[in-house]
Amino acid sequence: MNPATQLADGIATLGLSITESNQARLLQYLALIQKWNRVHNLTAVREPEAMLALHVLDSLAVLPHIGGSRIADVGSGAGLPGIPVALARPEWRVVLVESNHKKAAFLQQARIELGLENVEVIGERMEGVRSNAGFNTVISRAFSDLADFVKLAGHLCARGEEQGTDCGRLVAMKGVYPHEELAQLPETFIVDNILSLTIPGLRAKRHLVVLKRAGQ
């Protein structure tokens, strides 16, 4: 199956609507990762078909479960899930936070080449980033531990009064159900939802853990 067909079929299976032009930009993004990967080792996945499923479709699968006008992707790495999210939802403002200089340089180049006017790249450690308004969604697939995610990125979540009606959410992209991590969750954040996701082309388990501030 060629990449364009694989992508279109995957998007349809996920029940998403993404314009043809933005599907083409998603494929352009994939090609850009492959190009940079030869030198900078952005991802251990090398095979294009696997990369499309493991990175692009895996990122797009979160779309029905996140929202708000301001999204932060912390520990963004190669721009996952932030760049696919930004391409699929150009009306959202997406901030990519990545402290590794080579990866941050890739993100800046991708932003320019893909014409991502709704994307900002911050080349700093996430715990040092400050946002006056806070973010509706702070998402990451970089963390192996939920407690670390809360500790380092929790301050970026908008508080209820800043949102008008609701507080922001921390959203962690996980593999198997994280029983042990949930048991160690700090008291400052509680579970809002845990969703099991099916990714087209992947057999591996995927879960989305949604956290909110305790008391909000």
From Swiss-Prot:
Annotated GO MF terms: rRNA (guanine-N7-)-methyltransferase activity
Reaction catalyzed: guanosine(527) in 16S rRNA + S-adenosyl-L-methionine = N(7)-methylguanosine(527) in 16S rRNA + S-adenosyl-L-homocysteine
Pfam family, one: GidB
Entry EC number(s): 2.1.1.170
Record keywords: Cytoplasm, Methyltransferase, rRNA processing, S-adenosyl-L-methionine, Transferase
Subcellular location: Cytoplasm
One Gene Ontology cellular component: cytosol
InterPro entries on file: rRNA_ssu_MeTfrase_G, SAM-dependent_MTases_sf
Residues engaged in binding S-adenosyl-L-methionine: G75, L80, R141
Keyword S-adenosyl-L-methionine: yes
Membrane-crossing residue ranges in chain numbering: none
Coiled coil: none
Record-stated family: Belongs to the methyltransferase superfamily. RNA methyltransferase RsmG family.
Job of this protein: Specifically methylates the N7 position of guanine in position 527 of 16S rRNA.
Stated name of the protein: Ribosomal RNA small subunit methyltransferase G
Organism: Nitrosospira multiformis (strain ATCC 25196 / NCIMB 11849 / C 71)
